[in-house]
């Protein structure tokens, strides 16, 4: 009797054939880069995010650079992406990562969720994609 591939095997096979692997935030993955992409992608199409992400990373290549930037500069760079609360929360969260965690993103979902604008799915992405850990991503 032939056994059918499991759901996870079929899903991974589908990803190998059709999954996106060349997006800017998929290169040189760090917790910071994963976090920025996850926040930008909330309620925003990938094609819209790509140029914003590229510009944002060129101006703020590290969480420290973002934390030290004036909020007005961050909001100006965000112009056109919408949902400005995301940028405000990112700026405040960056300041907290620098001041409370020595510039290193926590590797715990529970701790990440204490930062402004980071919910369960974003925290899971940071842990899994940025730190190489295991956490659910919705």
Annotate each PLM feature.
Residues 3-138:
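Catalytic cores of DNA base-excision repair glycosylases
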């Amino acid at each position: 009797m032939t056994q059918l591939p499991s759901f996870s095997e079929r899903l991974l096979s589908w990803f190998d054939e059709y999954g996106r692997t060349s997006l800017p935030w998929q290169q040189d993955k760090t917790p910071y880069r994963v976090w920025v992409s996850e926040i930008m992608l909330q309620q925003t199409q990938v094609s819209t995010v790509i140029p914003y992400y590229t510009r944002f990373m060129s101006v703020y290549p590290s969480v420290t650079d973002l934390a030290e930037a004036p909020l007005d500069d961050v909001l100006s760079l965000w112009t056109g992406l919408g949902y400005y609360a995301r940028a405000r929360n990112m700026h405040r969260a960056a300041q907290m990562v620098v001041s409370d965690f020595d510039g290193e993103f926590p590797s715990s979902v529970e701790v990440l969720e204490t930062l402004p604008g980071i919910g369960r799915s974003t925290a899971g992405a940071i842990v899994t994609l940025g730190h190489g850990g295991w956490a659910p991503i919705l």
